[in-house]
Amino acid sequence: WFYCAYDIGSGAFTTWVYGKSKEGIISDFYRQMVRNYAEWGMCLPAEIECESSLNSTFRETLLSEGAMFRYVRMEANKARGKYIERVWEMQRYGKEKEREGWLARPNSLRESNQKSDEDIPIIPYEEIANNCLEDIVNWNNSAHPNQEKYPGKTRWEVFLENQHPDLKSINWNMILPYIGYKTETSCKAGTIKLQRKEFFLGMNGKI
């Protein structure tokens, strides 16, 4: 399973996580998104479009409007309802289809994409994951489709160079309680020990 975030304006993938099952993948996805944007020195996007099956558990918390994102569009589970599904179609029937072990869908509308009678080899999990990661990197480093507007720029360059100046800073207070990791510690004389470091609790300039 791969779960990814895609920036519509630049056409770049900005977050990706994967695993052998869906369990826990949505929390890992949002954690990784926050890590990425914080590391890049960027604000989180103003808006997110997501499907409801995995995201509904955060509907009243992390994904309530104004918490992690200013605007949230949670779409019912229909393939044509989300923009990213068109991107997945390009990925699936583009580079992925050329790889050994590609699995066709038996009910595909196009005959060329339907399952054949040939035996499909079993590909190791690590190889599949690495191929998908390579495809994401190559996609991001490919030319932006609107070269008239962004001449000579890749999707990734357009993403980095065109962040909106009015985006709000990461709302840590609304994010950490729901996807942050918790570590128990003790407090003695206004001092907390955490990860082999000491932190002091203060108020009005006093510990």
Map each language-model feature to its residues:
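C-terminal, beta-rich DNA-binding module of retroviral/retroelements integrases
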Residues: A129-I207
